[in-house]
Amino acid sequence: MSLQKTSITFSPGRAGDTPAYIALRGKTRQNAIGQERLAELGITAESWAEMIESGNLPGQVCHQDGQLIGYCFGDRESGEIVVLALLPEAEGLGIGKALLDRMMAELSAAGHARLFLGCSSDPQSRSYGFYRHLGWKSTGETDQYGDEVLEYLFT
């Protein structure tokens, strides 16, 4: 019997990889959004790449044995965590937390003392407990998509 080793790597998001980010977004277990719906929202591989290249949308990505399995992107100007997405097989391994931690550190280093994000208000949603467990708190506000706004304050 041989044990298979897997290689997990983290790196900054790259503009040239946005088609893969779009594809992964449609494969998440909850809140999957396909390419057509993203385009309706104004998010295309081209627009995403432009935001990365401008420096306004930094991101952290994770690969397992060279395959993209997750990412987290944030808005450098506002301090918003824009998206955290993982393939279902990457859930429960600490990868989501690691990606979020890296993105939070990057936005903190950019001068943000407060970060925010939109999250499902349904307690049955995985994201509901995930963010709260990590110290994110409800602001009592709802964003334009009907999601609850959570914030994280660096102390």
What are the residue ranges of the model-derived segments?
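Conserved N-terminal entry element of GNAT/NAT acetyltransferase domains
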Residues: 1-16, 155
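Acetyl-CoA-dependent GNAT
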Residues: 12-18, 22-83, 87-89, 100-102, ...
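Active-site beta-strand termini and strand-to-loop segments that position acidic
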Residues: 63-65, 152-155
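Active-site acidic-Proline motif in GNAT/NAT acetyltransferases
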Residues: 87-93, 121-123
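Conserved active-site alpha-helix within GNAT-family acetyltransferase domains
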Residues: 97, 122-140
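Conserved beta-strand-loop-alpha-helix junction that forms the acyl-donor binding cleft
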Residues: 117-127, 144-147
